[in-house]
Structure formats: C-alpha cells, structure tokens
Amino acid sequence: MLEVNDGTGVFADCTLLEEADLSQTGITELEGTFEGCSALETVKLPENITKIGFGTFTGCSSLEKMDLSQTLVTEIGGSAFSACSGLKTVKFPKTLTAIDSYAFLSCKNLTGELDLSQTAVKTIGICAFYKDGGVLGKIRLPKTITEIGSEAFSWETTDGPEKIYVITSLSKDKINAEAFKRNVPVVVCPYLYTIKFDGNGAAKGKMSEKACAAGQKEKLSK
C-alpha cells in the first residue's frame, strides 16, 4: 500500500492511473497532484480537504465528474481542472469562496448547468470557465460574488447560455472587461439587483428595484 501524506505532484504524469482513493488520508491541500494523468476516471478525496491547488487535475481528460459538495474546499486554484476535456459535471461545496484564473479552462464538455448559487464564492478569476468548444447551459451565481475576471465566462462559439442568473448588487461588485464576452440573456431575479451587459460583456448599470421586483429578462445586443 502506498502511503500518501503530501498532495503535491505525487501522481503527476502517471498516464496509466485510472483510479485514486485519498479519502482516508489526512491531506488538506492538493497541488499538481494528478497533472497529466490522462487515464484517470475516478477520484475520492478526503472530506477535510480545503484547497484544490494549482494544476491539480490539469490534463485529466478521462475525468467525467467531480463531486466536492461534501468537502471543506474554500479555493479552486489556477488551472486546477484546465484541459479536462471529458469533464461533464462539477458539484461545488458551500464553503467555496474563490475560483482562480483558468481553473476550468478548455473543459469543452462542461455544458450543463453551472450552479454556484449555494456557494460563498466571492471571486472568479480570469478565463476561469473559458471554453473553446461547447457552451454552458445555465450559470447561477451567488449573492456573495464581488469580482468576475476578464473573459471568465467567454467562449469561442456564437451561441451563449440559455440564461444567466445574476444574484448580486452592482454597487459592490467589480465586473471586468469581457467577463461575459458573447451576448446572452440575463434573468433579473425578483427583489434583487442585477447587472446589464453591453455587447462586449462590460457592466452597463443596474436595474431599478421596481424592475427587479417584477422580474425581467433582458436580451442584450451589440
């Protein structure tokens, strides 16, 4: 039995590794742990893990799902899941506060609903969910969000998500240039402020409280 006490790069480039169980270890942080493990299909993580660090699963093209909902993860680091071309679903924990730049870059099969509404996410980094193939179905953001990086939700195709739910107050938020690069419908959630975007995804002001209370759907154009 292999005893693992440190999650830094321990299985990097093990291209024949298909399954890994770290659930009984005391590891709380991972970094580069499974980078380049192209055959990896199943991973069990310890519930007390707090950080999925830089490049942890980069290039794990056979990984189809990741369930972090029962963990204590607060941060998903830069490029943590980049180039996971087979990744279809991700469940996020309530403890999550940050998704760093390029975290899910080029996850072309991550096309279902991206639901962050039950998390405590404050920041989403540059190109965090940038896609070069396929588009997200729906994006739900939490009311805790304070910053969305440039091209965080951009994609190469002209088709956008079905809807984007923005639950936030613009006066407290920072939305960087081209955060939502393509034109998308934005759903105004009842009794909450929301954000309108111009054709390049830049912030364009906020809806009135009256309009938000009624609930509206804004189709944005260039």
Locate each region found by the language model.
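Structural signature of tandem-repeat unit edges
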Residues: 1-5, 14-29, 38-51, 61-75, ...
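Consensus positions within tandem repeat domains that build extended binding/scaffold surfaces
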Residues: 8-12, 31-35, 53-58, 77-80, ...
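A structural signal for leucine-rich repeat
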Residues: 11-12, 34-35, 70, 118-119, ...
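Beta-strand secondary-structure signal
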Residues: 125, 194-196, 221
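Generic alpha-helical secondary structure signal
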Residues: 173-178, 218
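Solvent-exposed beta-strand/loop surfaces, strongest in extracytoplasmic domains of secreted
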Residues: 191-202, 216
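A short beta-strand segment in extracellular, disulfide-stabilized domains
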Residues: 215-222
